């Protein structure tokens, strides 16, 4: 089966599977953030050591986007998604078994890199979508991805508080393994779009960076936002635990604070004018 053979009905439910895959994979980056005090107590970590866990996870994600995503143009995306899902599931399981900071940090870095599976899924959705429905299908997958980000901290905080942080990672490993298997079964093979070697692919990215100023501005802006966002979440759970004696469930509850961000899209266009401060 090839991507061009998908009917509108088939594409619809496959896109739904891809949305689940994007959500579960990207959630792997954020599970640790509410669990840091639990990890610290269990592994006897300092505050600095706890902060390095989400930092290296995010760094791994950035490295994966830079060095692994270009492979999607040269290799079958179905195979890449399978390989990354297997690696991600194994790394999540390994994280649940770790007993010292050094191994936890290495595994966290690799989890971030493998979680770029989510970014392989998004272009796959665009390729599979029937003509004229690319925007809707990609939007569905992006909704799954954003829900994974939004709900991951809340889920991990509650699960960690009730069952412990290791159980959360074991459950995450199972979820990624299952959705990876389903995607392997339902996805068609994807055509290779480039015959460039890996060094040539990387060089082409440098060319794009130099040629498009808008791309540079967008990348730098999003990078700065990501750093600020990660700095907040890398310290929130620790601060809540040390100063307010609040557990991981409360820290995870902050994860749903972004939900009201979708409300303004449903409000009348005149409301922002009425709500604007008078100067």
How should these model regions be labeled?
Residues 2-8, 187-219:
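Juxtamembrane intracellular "pre-TM" segments in multi-pass secondary transporters
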Residues 11-31, 109, 211-228:
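Pair of pore-lining "gating" transmembrane helices in MFS-fold secondary transporters
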Residues 13, 17-47, 65, 118, ...:
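Extracytoplasmic
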Residues 30, 58-66, 116, 149-150, ...:
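Residue-level signature of mid-helix packing/kink "hotspots" within the transmembrane helices
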Residues 63-101:
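Conserved MFS/SLC helix-loop-helix module at the cytosolic interface between two early adjacent transmembrane helices
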Residues 65-76, 264-277:
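Helix-to-loop junctions at the C-terminal end of transmembrane segments
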Residues 103, 140-187:
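Helix-loop-helix hairpin linking two adjacent transmembrane segments in secondary transporters
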Residues 107-144:
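Cytoplasmic helix-loop-helix junction between adjacent transmembrane helices
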């Amino acid at each position: 089966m090839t991507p061009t053979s998908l009917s509108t009905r088939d594409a619809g439910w496959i896109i739904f599977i891809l949305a689940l895959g994007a959500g579960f994979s990207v959630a792997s980056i954020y599970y640790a953030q509410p669990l840091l005090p639990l990890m610290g107590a269990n592994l006897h970590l300092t505050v600095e050591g706890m902060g390095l866990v989400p930092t290296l996870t995010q760094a791994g994600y950035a490295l994966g986007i830079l060095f692994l995503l270009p492979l999607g143009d040269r290799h079958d995306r179905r195979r890449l998604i399978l390989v990354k899902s297997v690696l991600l599931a194994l790394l999540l399981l390994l994280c649940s078994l770790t007993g010292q900071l050094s191994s936890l940090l290495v595994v966290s870095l690799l989890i971030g890199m493998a979680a770029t599976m989510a970014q392989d899924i998004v272009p796959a959705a665009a390729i599979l979508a029937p003509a004229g429905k690319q925007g809707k299908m990609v939007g569905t997958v992006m909704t799954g991805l954003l829900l994974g980000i939004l709900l991951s901290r809340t889920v991990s905080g509650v699960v960690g508080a009730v069952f412990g942080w290791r159980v959360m990672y074991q459950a995450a490993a199972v979820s990624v393994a299952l959705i990876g298997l389903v995607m392997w079964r339902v996805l068609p093979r994807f055509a290779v779009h480039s015959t460039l070697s890996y060094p040539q692919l990387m060089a082409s990215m440098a060319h794009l960076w130099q040629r498009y100023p808008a791309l540079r501005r967008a990348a730098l802006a999003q990078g700065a936002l990501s750093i600020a966002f990660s700095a907040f979440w890398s310290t929130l759970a620790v601060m809540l635990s040390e100063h307010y004696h609040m557990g991981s469930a409360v820290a995870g509850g902050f994860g749903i604070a972004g939900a009201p961000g979708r409300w303004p899209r449903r409000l009348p266009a005149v409301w922002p004018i009425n709500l604007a401060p008078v100067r």
